[in-house]
Amino acid sequence: MLNILQDFSDLSQKRLDALMADYIVRTKALESYILGLTNLTWQTLMQPYLDYTDGFAFKSITLMKDLHPDKTVRNNVANFHSDFINQIQLLHNNDVRTVFKRYATTQYLVEESTLTPEQVNFFNKHSDFLSWVDDGKFDMDGMNKLSIEINTLNCKINEHYMTSYPNTQFTQEELDYGSSNISYIKKRHIRKIVREEWQDHKSAMIPTMERVAFAKQEQATLQGFAQHSDVALYGTMIKTTQALNTFLDKAHIMLKPYIDRDMSILRDYAKADGIDELQDYDIPYYLRIHKDKLTQLSLNCEKKYFPYHRTVQNILHLFEVFLGYTFTEIHNKKLVWHKSVRLLEVKENDTTKGYVYLDIVQRHGKQSDRFYHVAVVEKSLHTLPVSIVDCSFDGGYFSFSNIKTLFHELGHAMHNISSTATISLMSSVFCETDFIEAPSQFFEYWCCSPTILKCISPGIPDDIITGILKNAKLMKGYVWGLDLVNCKMDMAFHSKEFKGYSYALAYNIYDKILGGGLSDKNLYVECQPMFSGYDVQYYRYMYSLSIAFELLSVFEGRELDPVLGKRFRDEVLSQGALRPSLESVVKFLGREPDMTAFLKIVQ
């Protein structure tokens, strides 16, 4: 078993240089080995390649560009990460691909019947990438140059968002609740300033974002695709740009009555304050006012039932009971990057399944609105899964929204931990990208029941639970409408019709779905995830949510059934790319999924 837990006590430039040098040496050694092969079999060609991909279990170190408290380390690791991504291109050159193609067209056909289903599925899924050869009609050098440019620009975009923030200081008189959270700012002109500062901050990256979009389109053209969205959807459940646009249009038709209802409610609040035209910077404030009014449950009243340490422990215990795991904390200062980070060993009976890092408290060196899960190591013959759950909670008390977020991100971690793959590229997190959110959304909504809430906070009054769950369901029309705006913006960015970003582009999409109110300084630059590997991926939250609700419907009245929980683990969480996700869902449900559960929630 490879060493999968990294030493974070030394992230000096010297160590990073040594890691990069080792990576380059091993890459060149594998290239030389492959080019010298005369006997091409799975064991001589494919297995060494897979072992090589498993041998770089330092992805957790690259995450330190976002998580380490030392700014110098963050910057050094950001450069290391960029170099690492660019170096990946070196192994997949034409000479190496020629060897893979020779194997694919000769010996693989002979030995296919002797390979495991996992090996066959892997080869079918990745053989095009591994064995594609430049026949002289394709500009491989151009593709590689564009990939390097895209990666470099994406790193620049992310660095801008991670290291630079608006910093206007307001007086206590200007901030009604002492918070710069826009949903708590009563004075409209202050709300506008706060929103426009963030938009100015984000807009600084628009030319860079445009260049990334154009470079991706150039790559798509080189590959023979009409647009980048066609490339990005290859191998997904939804498959094509046309199918995705059809799904979004149908979703809009289905959701429009609820979007219009919620926007009308918000406009009425604004009119009561003398505001004739609701603007985007007004919405968070009136959204909170409406929820507080209907639930009569203040945030502070809600939060007092969820003290940080007790809540985290109770949530972890719920996952233990439901999935049949145990979590044990490992105390080793070298294995964490900050004293607030917890490292958990996950076991099933006495067998270690993997490890989960919890870096979930806001602190110096972390972006204030980060809520992520990253699988830094995937399951294989030589590795166990390692996940990092990265959130920015205040460490005092949880809101219910915080709790849902933690369930969601822990759901991703359990998806990774539960993998039974022997090839890392077939592990749970390599399922179709438009299914990967379904398990985490399952857990996010699993906690939306009185049974689970009473386990999280024993003794919580029933009327508080009623208020919390009512609050969680309010204004879903607006929330899904905003999701549709993001989906449409994502598709616009990555379509062949994209000519550049503009207020007109943003307004037309925003107005069609939410009915106007996009302020003239707001280019709606909420698309940074598009430049972090999420391009043409916004739709997957809504698409996978319909599947998550189907899975969740089986647990109605049986939320803590451990037998059912373990069957969910084995049939859904553990499978990953070992079989099509639809097959896993059908095996668990005992039927084809439909939109029944989703429509029930919407209505």
Set out the residue ranges of the language-model regions:
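Long, well-ordered alpha-helical segments
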Residues: 60, 225, 411-421, 449-454
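A conserved hydrophobic secondary-structure block that centers on an alpha-helix together
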Residues: 136-137, 141, 200-211, 218, ...
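C-terminal, non-catalytic "cap/extension" segments appended to globular domains
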Residues: 2-22, 28, 34-36, 124-127, ...
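N-terminal helix-rich structural modules
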Residues: 1-178, 182
